[in-house]
Amino acid sequence: MATFKVTLINEAEGTKHEIEVPDDEYILDAAEEEGYDLPFSCRAGACSTCAGKLVSGTVDQSDQSFLDDDQIEAGYVLTCVAYPTSDVVIQTHKEEDLY
């Protein structure tokens, strides 16, 4: 099992947190375990509450059913169903930017 460095950036609050996330754990779950309060609602990849924007790196979010191909291509990620597949940097709290 690989572990990756996930950097979570909240531009509105000016915060940046780095956490280690195993490749078999969702980013949202790992962030919560570390005490970070990220937005979420369904926890199933079926809404946009937890949306973030991928700055660098790659994730597997094949469990999600909400984002369309254009949004995924633009770098949006649902942290509740995203596994890191490399070191990643994600801007959090991006739900409003989807629309």
From Swiss-Prot:
Q: Which cofactor does it need?
A: [2Fe-2S] cluster
Annotated residues for binding of [2Fe-2S] cluster: 42, 47, 50, 80
Q: Record keywords: Phosphoprotein included?
A: no
Pfam families assigned to the protein according to its UniProt record, in alphabetical order: Fer2
What are the residue boundaries of the 2Fe-2S ferredoxin-type domain, all occurrences included? 4-96
Question: Molecular function terms in GO for this entry?
Answer: 2 iron, 2 sulfur cluster binding; electron transfer activity; metal ion binding
Q: What does the record's cofactor remark say about binding?
A: Binds 1 [2Fe-2S] cluster.
BP GO annotations: electron transport chain
Q: Which UniProt keywords apply?
A: 2Fe-2S, Electron transport, Iron, Iron-sulfur, Metal-binding, Transport
* Function according to Swiss-Prot or TrEMBL: Ferredoxins are iron-sulfur proteins that transfer electrons in a wide variety of metabolic reactions.
Q: Which PANTHER family match?
A: FERREDOXIN, FERREDOXIN-2, CHLOROPLASTIC
User: Would you identify the family this protein belongs to, as annotated?
Assistant: Belongs to the 2Fe2S plant-type ferredoxin family.
Please identify the protein, giving its name as recorded: Ferredoxin
